[in-house]
Regions:
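Terminal accessory/targeting
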Residues: 1-80, 96-105, 164, 212, ...
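Sparse, context-dependent recognition of short Cys/His-centered cofactor- or disulfide-binding micro-motifs
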Residues: 11, 15-16, 66-68, 117, ...
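Catalytic domains of cell-wall/extracellular-matrix polysaccharide-remodeling enzymes
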Residues: 139-245, 249-267, 271-272, 278-282
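Active-site beta->alpha N-cap acidic-glycine motif
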Residues: 43-176, 281-282
Length: 283
């Protein structure tokens, strides 16, 4: 590249053009923020033998590779389709795909201020039978993982912002940004923060929810719908109890395109679609 610029007579117009193109791509949602990949694949973060996507306090509905039998009321094979980081301009397409298939999903929502105009979609999603769960107000790791107090302040702000659209006080399911085994929290709150937060969630009678299938739809490069579909099929493998991580943010529009094929594959392979609350009912 240095030689190319020198041959071009030292002009910087090329760099200005590249910068302008990159900024335009980011604005259009084709470039994914650097924080998005954190926590996508739990087994790449910390060793998690006998991994279950649910809190330890959960009933016996752990994943099949954990060797824990399903609760009697649950089907032999089930899948929870979960979507993080919405609502956004992508959410109507996601809802349309789910509704067309007669399938209910679970939305772990954010309320960053940037997506404020899409928050009314939560009312529509809840009315259609989809589950609304908590994710983060800001999704800024450096803010929410400074301390336990900072994390719960963020959750309180999230509930406040979504309260006009859903019954926020009744929500008892959440997903930690980056997942429960994320390592990014250690940079800001220390090694003991995540164990503390998990304990505090359980003490409230809530459940935190991870995943055991990652669509890898937010790992950068704007993966195609076909790539997302193949990622889900590959990661599902022989598992019979699946919690699938996907996103309905403005930067993951191809996830909505992939959903019909993902749903069809699970249906063809004998899976029953559940919300997280159906797979993990709380008393």
């Amino acid at each position: 590249m240095k030689q190319f610029v020198q041959r071009a007579g030292g002009r910087i117009g090329l760099w200005g053009g590249l910068l302008a193109a990159a900024l335009a791509a980011f604005a259009a949602g084709w470039l994914v923020p650097a924080r998005a990949p954190v926590g996508c694949k739990l087994n790449e973060l910390t060793a998690a033998p006998d991994f279950s996507p649910f809190s330890p306090a959960a009933p016996a509905v752990a994943t099949s590779d954990a060797g824990t039998p399903a609760a009697p009321s649950l089907p032999e094979k089930w899948v929870c389709l979960t979507l993080d980081d919405g609502p956004s301009k992508t959410t109507p397409e996601v809802l349309a795909a789910l509704d067309a298939a007669g399938v209910h999903g679970t939305f772990f929502v954010v309320a960053t201020g940037y997506n404020e105009k899409y928050l009314p979609l939560l009312t529509q999603a809840a009315a259609a039978g989809h589950q609304i769960a908590l994710h983060s107000a800001s999704h800024e790791y450096s803010d929410i993982y400074r301390s336990s107090a900072a994390y719960w302040k963020d959750i309180a702000l999230l509930k406040q912002r979504i309260a006009p659209y859903v019954d926020a006080e009744s929500i008892r399911y959440l997903r930690f940004p980056g997942g429960s085994t994320n390592t990014v929290s250690r940079r800001y709150g220390g090694k003991g923060l995540m164990p503390q937060l998990k304990t505090e969630v359980e003490q409230r009678g809530w459940q935190w929810v991870d995943w055991n299938v990652c669509a890898e739809d937010a790992v950068g490069g704007h993966p195609s719908a076909d790539t997302i579909y193949r990622n889900v099929v590959r990661e599902t493998g022989e598992q019979t109890h699946c919690v699938v991580l996907m996103h309905d943010s403005a930067t993951t529009r191809t996830t909505a395109e992939a959903l019909p094929d993902i749903i069809r594959w699970y249906a063809d392979n004998g899976y029953t679609f559940l919300t997280v609350a159906e797979a993990l009912p709380l008393g």
